[in-house]
């Protein structure tokens, strides 16, 4: 709903990786935190500790520039073919440690759709991609049997849109 309200979409894992590798992005390395006994991974304490660490990392990058993308500090909730084939699961990908190692390869099996913890983020992207000089709506690219590969790394057309179901 938030993405829809802003006219945006969640990225695919392939897009998150491209953002990570793009020139000019600001890299704030991921730092993991463990819950205390009896605490869950979505606790306020873990979120605050993670946020403080991210703020510390940002302060070391010089003056704030709102035109630069900050990445690597969180795992992304992503979309892709999983949302069509496994609608009850949430796909998580990314986060990079300061040494460049990835935190989470694409995981499409282990987390129910309601899963949430301090280390995730919902990065929003514009719902258009430039292909051969033409702007394409992402929903059309997902359904295209050839161009879908650009977003997902997989060939063949989908039978539906990769998005998370709305629970009201």
Please give the residue ranges for each predicted region.
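Repeat-unit-sized solenoid/scaffold elements
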Residues: 30-53, 84-87, 91-93, 102-110, ...
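Conserved hydrophobic ligand-interaction patch in extracellular adhesion modules
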Residues: 2-65, 124
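Low-complexity, Gly/Ser/Thr/Pro-rich intrinsically disordered linker/tail segments
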Residues: 111, 115-168
């Amino acid at each position: 709903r938030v993405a829809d309200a802003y006219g945006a979409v969640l990225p695919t894992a392939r897009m998150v990786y491209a953002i990570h590798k793009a020139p000019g992005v600001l890299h704030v390395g991921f730092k993991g935190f463990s819950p205390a006994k009896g605490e869950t991974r979505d606790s306020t304490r873990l979120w605050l500790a993670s946020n403080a660490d991210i703020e510390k990392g940002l302060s070391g990058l010089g003056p704030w520039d709102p035109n630069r993308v900050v990445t690597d500090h969180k795992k992304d909730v992503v979309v892709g073919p999983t949302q069509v084939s496994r609608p009850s699961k949430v796909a998580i990908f990314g986060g990079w440690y300061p040494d460049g190692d990835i935190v989470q390869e694409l995981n499409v099996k282990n987390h129910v759709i309601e899963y949430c913890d301090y280390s995730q983020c919902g990065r929003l992207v514009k719902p258009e991609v430039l292909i051969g000089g033409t702007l394409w709506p992402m929903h059309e690219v997902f359904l295209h049997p050839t161009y879908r590969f650009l977003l997902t790394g997989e060939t063949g057309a989908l039978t539906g849109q990769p998005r998370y179901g709305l629970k009201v």
